[in-house]
């Protein structure tokens, strides 16, 4: 499994490197004045086309930086973490994160955000076995007004649900339910805001205590009822040619163990096209400023997001 993830990352990195295309060069022959006029016309048309394409890509990049934008997207997020446990083990996670908007009426949208983790974990203990499998699904629904507030804020609120489908090593083994909220503002190329949720376990098995966790970790420790809080502040800058530079934290507080997990991710993304398909490629570095005992030290992220604008 680890080999497959590494191979996938290599291929996606190659796509990221070559997908921006090569510049084209006009050939010259025949009458100088005629060709100069034609070239000027073509240059003007190409420049106009390039400007329009760049503007369209930047607009899509701006939408993508909004977690509750009314746009279908399909992110495939590869995460690599290292330094886990006594063996300094590696962990690979592919998060499949489809986003679907639904129009409720003239004023409101419902945004569905799903996270399905596929995990490969080297044994963090000496003599242990490596484990691969899926984790629990985290399903969020945001009821969001179509129009921003008078001050330009975009917001959404709704329920978050943890669905226990994961392999035994990666599941909380119980349904989880709680509130989720997001608020953000977009102006002058900047996007900034925060996403928050909290999940309580609602049907823990008899051999587990209640889980109290906001956005439960995909590799939960102990058999407890979920009780966890997740906080994701973010800031991004989108350039006119659709580059995005962002900084985000994905902080979790486990109320059972009284422990914080505080990774901060610095990333850069480029929105481009493969044929007519708009795709965003992102690479990032993650550092854990705080983690439970045996938690990871640092990690990497690579995301390919396919966009389906209306």
Task: Name these PLM-found stretches.
Residues 2-11:
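Bacterial N-terminal signal peptides that target proteins for export
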Residues 28-310:
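Transmembrane beta-barrel domains of Gram-negative outer membranes and organellar outer membranes
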Residues 2, 18-19, 32:
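Intrinsic disorder and flexible/low-complexity segments
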Residues 10-20:
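Bacterial N-terminal signal peptides
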Residues 20-26:
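Sec/Tat signal peptide C-region and signal peptidase I cleavage site
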């Amino acid at each position: 499994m680890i080999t497959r993830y590494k191979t996938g990352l290599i291929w996606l990195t190659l796509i990221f490197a070559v997908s921006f295309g090569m510049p084209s060069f006009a050939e010259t022959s025949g009458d100088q004045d005629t060709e100069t006029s034609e070239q000027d016309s073509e240059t003007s048309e190409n420049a106009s086309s390039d400007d329009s394409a760049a503007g369209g890509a930047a607009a899509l990049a701006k939408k993508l930086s909004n977690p509750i934008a009314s746009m279908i997207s399909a992110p495939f997020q590869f995460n690599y973490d290292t330094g886990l446990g006594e063996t300094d083990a590696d962990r690979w996670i592919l998060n499949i994160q489809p986003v679907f908007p639904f129009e409720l009426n003239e004023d409101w949208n419902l945004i569905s955000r799903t996270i399905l983790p596929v995990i490969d974990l080297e044994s963090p203990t000496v003599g242990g076995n490596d484990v691969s499998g899926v984790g629990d699904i985290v399903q969020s629904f945001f009821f969001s007004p179509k129009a921003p507030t008078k001050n330009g804020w975009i917001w959404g609120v709704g329920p978050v649900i943890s669905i226990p489908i994961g392999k035994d090593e990666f599941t909380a083994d119980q349904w989880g339910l709680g509130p989720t909220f997001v608020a953000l503002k977009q102006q002058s190329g900047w996007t900034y805001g925060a996403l928050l949720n909290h999940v309580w376990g609602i049907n823990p098995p008899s051999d587990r205590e209640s889980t109290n966790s906001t956005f439960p970790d995909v590799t939960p420790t102990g058999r407890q009822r979920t009780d966890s809080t997740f906080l994701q502040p973010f800031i991004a800058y989108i350039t006119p040619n659709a580059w995005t530079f962002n900084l985000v934290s994905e902080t979790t507080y486990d109320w059972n163990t009284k422990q914080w997990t505080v990774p901060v991710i610095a990333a850069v993304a480029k929105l481009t096209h493969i044929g007519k398909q708009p795709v965003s490629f992102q690479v990032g570095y993650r550092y854990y400023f705080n983690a439970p005992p045996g938690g990871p030290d640092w990690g990497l992220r690579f995301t390919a997001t396919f966009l389906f604008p209306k």
